[in-house]
Amino acid sequence: MGQTVTTPLSLTLGHWKDVERIAHNQSVDVKKRRWVTFCSAEWPTFNVGWPRDGTFNRDLITQVKIKVFSPGPHGHPDQVPYIVTWEALAFDPPPWVKPFVHPKPPPPLPPSAPSLPLEPPRSTPPRSSLYPALTPSLGAKPKPQVLSDSGGPLIDLLTEDPPPYRDPRPPPSDRDGNGGEATPAGEAPDPSPMASRLRGRREPPVADSTTSQAFPLRAGGNGQLQYWPFSSSDLYNWKNNNPSFSEDPGKLTALIESVLITHQPTWDDCQQLLGTLLTGEEKQRVLLEARKAVRGDDGRPTQLPNEVDAAFPLERPDWDYTTQAGRNHLVHYRQLLLAGLQNAGRSPTNLAKVKGITQGPNESPSAFLERLKEAYRRYTPYDPEDPGQETNVSMSFIWQSAPDIGRKLERLEDLKNKTLGDLVREAEKIFNKRETPEEREERIRRETEEKEERRRTEDEQKEKERDRRRHREMSKLLATVVSGQKQDRQGGERRRSQLDRDQCAYCKEKGHWAKDCPKKPRGPRGPRPQTSLLTLDDQGGQGQEPPPEPRITLKVGGQPVTFLVDTGAQHSVLTQNPGPLSDKSAWVQGATGGKRYRWTTDRKVHLATGKVTHSFLHVPDCPYPLLGRDLLTKLKAQIHFEGSGAQVMGPMGQPLQVLTLNIEDEHRLHETSKEPDVSLGSTWLSDFPQAWAETGGMGLAVRQAPLIIPLKATSTPVSIKQYPMSQEARLGIKPHIQRLLDQGILVPCQSPWNTPLLPVKKPGTNDYRPVQDLREVNKRVEDIHPTVPNPYNLLSGLPPSHQWYTVLDLKDAFFCLRLHPTSQPLFAFEWRDPEMGISGQLTWTRLPQGFKNSPTLFDEALHRDLADFRIQHPDLILLQYVDDLLLAATSELDCQQGTRALLQTLGNLGYRASAKKAQICQKQVKYLGYLLKEGQRWLTEARKETVMGQPTPKTPRQLREFLGTAGFCRLWIPGFAEMAAPLYPLTKTGTLFNWGPDQQKAYQEIKQALLTAPALGLPDLTKPFELFVDEKQGYAKGVLTQKLGPWRRPVAYLSKKLDPVAAGWPPCLRMVAAIAVLTKDAGKLTMGQPLVILAPHAVEALVKQPPDRWLSNARMTHYQALLLDTDRVQFGPVVALNPATLLPLPEEGLQHNCLDILAEAHGTRPDLTDQPLPDADHTWYTDGSSLLQEGQRKAGAAVTTETEVIWAKALPAGTSAQRAELIALTQALKMAEGKKLNVYTDSRYAFATAHIHGEIYRRRGLLTSEGKEIKNKDEILALLKALFLPKRLSIIHCPGHQKGHSAEARGNRMADQAARKAAITETPDTSTLLIENSSPYTSEHFHYTVTDIKDLTKLGAIYDKTKKYWVYQGKPVMPDQFTFELLDFLHQLTHLSFSKMKALLERSHSPYYMLNRDRTLKNITETCKACAQVNASKSAVKQGTRVRGHRPGTHWEIDFTEIKPGLYGYKYLLVFIDTFSGWIEAFPTKKETAKVVTKKLLEEIFPRFGMPQVLGTDNGPAFVSKVSQTVADLLGIDWKLHCAYRPQSSGQVERMNRTIKETLTKLTLATGSRDWVLLLPLALYRARNTPGPHGLTPYEILYGAPPPLVNFPDPDMTRVTNSPSLQAHLQALYLVQHEVWRPLAAAYQEQLDRPVVPHPYRVGDTVWVRRHQTKNLEPRWKGPYTVLLTTPTALKVDGIAAWIHAAHVKAADPGGGPSSRLTWRVQRSQNPLKIRLTREAP
């Protein structure tokens, strides 16, 4: 046991290469998939005994070959290569087939004493067993053999005998040499090793050598067959050691298959086996599938009961197993049983289950692969071991592996050629190299510390810089103040008037001095005030006073801070360092100037009204902390000025107290005061604490079981990463997450599902609420039918008699329903909170918001829970819309009692209502956006303000929002559909949004209608309804009313647009359609109550007897079923309606008969008839023909008499027969202009169009019922026009293809033959089409201007007075304006260039001469904006000159270039090139960053060549980085950035990049090495020693001599160190460098002095700028932009920060270039402050 079973099919698949080789020798090709299909599925149906696993039985192969080669329809030519190859394997077997192909046995010897009747010898069995079998050969009884360990199959599948098998080999010769003596017939061979193992305790049978045995029937010692049933231990072991059939059908099927092969059970044994291993239901399913597999004589499954019962009986059959027929029946039965097991065990395909298998965190790839394969076997019909399925299994293995493993597997090179084993090995490597959790935590900790350290260092540097800048500014400020004070003092001394000798210096009076002045105050001298810091040591200045009162002390961040109350300050200010500062800043303007200061992060502030978070301005220069208007507003402070000073009081006039408040309740501090709520007193809260969310906590529906969310069959888990979230938003939703975690609504989890969390800011506050994006989950969840009530008709169940209302809004309603644990992982999301130790996923244990089925599930649950309340209170009306409840009663007492009962019920059920939103026992409430009062409903003011506050729409989306909002109020707006008609076309996709006067008028009318919206009565279902209907221009309008005393009270205003078909009917029929449409809409409000229809037309007669020419049968039936329901719909008298109110007028309207009007409007021509005219001038026959000939549809039309052809013409290819009929009929009418004509046609289409449908099409605008344009529109219009040409006309329909000899038959045949002949023989002439398209460009529409006449006179054109147009070159001349319109339209269609359109027009042979065609065409093509944005443009900008250094090492160009493959991580090469000498330095790098650039500049270039003066680079990220630019500023380097996408600007280094790459490529090919880093020095050597433009190499320019190649220096350098030759060489080098450098510098300077032709663009020009990276269908040019600045080679335009090379722009002015510009002249005006600008042509 445990070894594999080898079958012929598996054997050939294992040696498939040999099979293909044998097939090629047979000159055929075979495919593996078709080989398996034919062997296992096709050939077993031939009814020749072919087993599903193949056989090498030559007789069976021959029989299958006969079936395949059968002539006629029963043959199978596609199977010929495969059966021929199989035959070659059996008749000429390769070595691996020979052991399975048995030679034919010799004829058997007659037995000496047979104990059983003998059967005639035969070479092969008539029927096959479960596996292919060969006839065993006869032989002597061999010695018992020991089971070898050869690894071969344990069961000989190529023999028919049951265990023990007979030896298939020929009998061995006798030991004594009696070779001719055979073994006695009575001896039987030993059992096979397998049989010995299974049945070792039983005696081996002694059977006749000529009798086939079927176990458990075995021949005993006396020659009688014995029966050996299954043992109980076998059945017990099989049942307990194998999974059930439902759990793993494949494994149990394999077990039963092996039992059927090895044990050869009888019918009873099979039943016992099935009854033991299968359940009753499984057994019935297997038997049913087995009976379905029974095939009839034709090889197809049969359903004949007798054949099915004979092959697979359900009752014990009377088969005799001692006969060959009985054994054949048993073999066939086992085959069918096995087929039934296989079919019954085939589970439905569920790929979602397979995709749900993912690799665990610590699961090895091998274990995961086994689970994946097991899922394929269990949930799909595919075998994962099949080579054809290896690709699918490999892709599943990659996609469903752990994320880190999957990502690395996806990046493997040559992935498509990797086998599954290769992927597993790679995954094992990745799995074994994973970092441990400890290592990961250590890495994260280390990265966090490094990040914090960097941030701390940056903050310290910023703080130091800020302090340094602040000290510098303070120093400047102090110096300014001190100098100013000194100047003031000195200036004051100079300005003081001189005192007289007896004048007092204090009071300026004469007669005494200052010391004796009586006015001078006396007393002890007070302490001298301290000198202010601003005055330093100035003795003459007055010091700064301490800050005056009022002051107030508040706690900020837990620390007390004393603030100066400053009502003039907009924001509150802190002076001390408050900790971390935010990135936001503000500009502060003070008396000494303006400066930018930063904001603090949010700080907790304790106010009198609570604790709030607030952000302060950090102004260190401010002398005192300020309490500004922002905090004073939150404080609600009151400042009183009294004699003792200012006092700061609270909002109630009391001293400020400190109150601590949760941050999540901060928004309540900003809420405006509301009117006192008299309806909800404390008694309601105290009497029902469990019913309110404020007192009862979170609700839980106790009667509802946890909900299970079913997924779609093909759904797979979706995982979307969390979107980036700002710190403010995260802190805002953090309290909500914490609250939900504390309540158990959120719990941590690990789930393959993940959707992002979106923080949404509440309007008017700084609070956030978490909203989960569940759109992807909603797509994968099964849809359920929504049962939420429609708010449109919900209030129809509220009678006007119930005028006391209670409205309750359930709080957190969805959270009242629990989720089943199996469905909770669907709604997982990411959340990290280091303070709480949460870093992972959270999910909901309650029904979440945002889930598409949440409203329906909650609505149904609440309906079930409130069913008892409705039964117990039948007098109350309870309406429910999801979580909004409305309770209505007839009196206040009933309303109070009902409300108490409802609150008690809600509390007991576990639901919680919001006390803040409750409206209890009131006569006026707001519900679902309506205002309910006294049995009427009004639009709320908030709803009106929402519509009125919307600005004029600018986009289709804004318009859709407006129409959606206004459409909610359409019941209050009479004729809303007609009013909004101009707006709806602009909402369609692909329509140009053109807001015109009509749209603005409709927009204003809708807003005005909302302001005057009336009150609508609530529908009273106990009274009948009246519907007043009117129709105007395809719009149905109506008002639904009910009588209130003698008046009619409106219930709803209805309006709707009719469909295109009904809109084309006569007015009377349009009224029928309008009534039907509005009756259907009114039914939503009337709930099937009686309805009386009043209209200005007597439509009841029309509905009962509708005209047959306008309405289809389906529409007629629909109208009659809807409007002739007398129990529900009745028609009132005809009334005239007021257009404003849609109510009847007091006077009667004009009466008319609708049937008479319809009879008059049935056709286009009143005298058109279908009866022949007796006095007709002509009687013609028309016909059109359309046929296929040689794959092409040809068409023709003809007009004939009975004997001759009047007109016949071939029509363009592809013309339909209907169109040809219309053309023929139209041609006949044209030729009979002014005459009397009888015309016959056999086309029902043409006849009906002329008599009936033409007028209908014309009225509805030639549109179909779907609103699309009808077919053959032009032909129908031409026919309708031609109907009026004959004087009198009769169009008669005649049957087609008549065979009689009447005049109609002969004429019809003549027309048919002529049309067919014209279609086949003639060439269609497209230039002479019958239908003349109406064109606006006709001579009668031409209007020539004065300029046109002047141009025509110069051309020499002639004016035709009769035809009233000019003629030139024999053609009518088209005016200039017409030419422009035509050419502009053609260009908009084609967007061709000037030359292409000119050539196209010249070849078109236009019947008109287009005036000024070329000039107009050129103007159109040059001013086309679309062409300017897309078409390429040739650059006319000449090359500029390149600036070079004046000596080596002063001017470098730098660039990064990428070199692949990047060995050892080196992917980039940083190249430096000296622009003076051309010397190159290149460094391999692993990254392309600014850090690498600065490192190489400071460590390599500076120590060797000195500090550069100029660096030139492109605009790469490494060069424009702040790091690079800062280093350049500190070192005094002029860093020049070249134009973007202009490699010529960095031409020297770009060319050197190419040289290096080419050299490295050659070196790698020559050396065979792939390490380009190793070969780089050789490439640099070549570049440094290549002569430049002046014949010198960079090495010679730098060192003054060629490089040494073969001269090696003496190892002892001490002898030459101070030798005269070395000194002379150095002196010569100095002289040579000067002789070389000076001419080079002069040559470079000469290039710079050479004048450069600048580009033609100037400041103020308008240009298009090339878009270098265009996306799909994006224009090539963007703009236009205005030029602001220019250089000889570049431009600076408005709107783009970078400079743009002149080659990347093109002119956007109409002239096509900068040369063609307008001239502006400046003139003075009478007003000195105004000038006049006039534009002149160049």
UniProtKB/Swiss-Prot annotation:
The modification Phosphoserine is found at S192. Residues 430-435 are annotated as: Interaction with host UBE2I. Residues 741-932 form the Reverse transcriptase domain. Mg(2+) 4 binds at D1455, D1514. Residues 345-393 are annotated as: Interaction with host PIAS4. Residues 1444-1602 form the Integrase catalytic domain. Its cofactor is Mg(2+). Changing S137A: No effect on reverse transcription activity. InterPro entries: Aspartic_peptidase_AS, DNA/RNA_pol_sf, G_retro_matrix, G_retro_matrix_sf, Gag-pol_Znf-H3C2, Gag_p12, Gag_P30, Integrase_cat-core. A motif (PPXY motif) lies at residues 162-165. A motif (LYPX(n)L motif) lies at residues 130-134. Changing S192A: Complete loss of stable anchoring of viral PIC to mitotic chromosomes. Residues 108-124 have a biased composition (Pro residues). Changing S192A: Complete loss of reverse transcription activity. A zinc finger (HHCC-type) spans 1387-1427. DNA binds at R943, R957, R960, F968, W1065, R1115, Q1189, S1216, Q1218. Mg(2+) 3 binds at D1183, E1221, D1242. A motif (PTAP/PSAP motif) lies at residues 111-114. Keywords: Aspartyl protease, Capsid protein, Coiled coil, DNA integration, DNA recombination, DNA-binding, DNA-directed DNA polymerase, Endonuclease, Eukaryotic host gene expression shutoff by virus, Eukaryotic host translation shutoff by virus, Host cell membrane, Host cytoplasm, Host endosome, Host gene expression shutoff by virus, Host membrane, Host-virus interaction, Hydrolase, Lipoprotein, Magnesium, Manganese, Membrane, Metal-binding, Multifunctional enzyme, Myristate, Nuclease, Nucleotidyltransferase, Phosphoprotein, Protease, RNA suppression of termination, RNA-binding, RNA-directed DNA polymerase, Transferase, Ubl conjugation, Viral genome integration, Viral matrix protein, Viral nucleoprotein, Virion, Virus entry into host cell, Zinc, Zinc-finger. Residues 560-631 form the Peptidase A2 domain. It holds the Pfam family RVP. PANTHER family: GAG_P30 DOMAIN-CONTAINING PROTEIN (PTHR33166). This is Gag-Pol polyprotein.
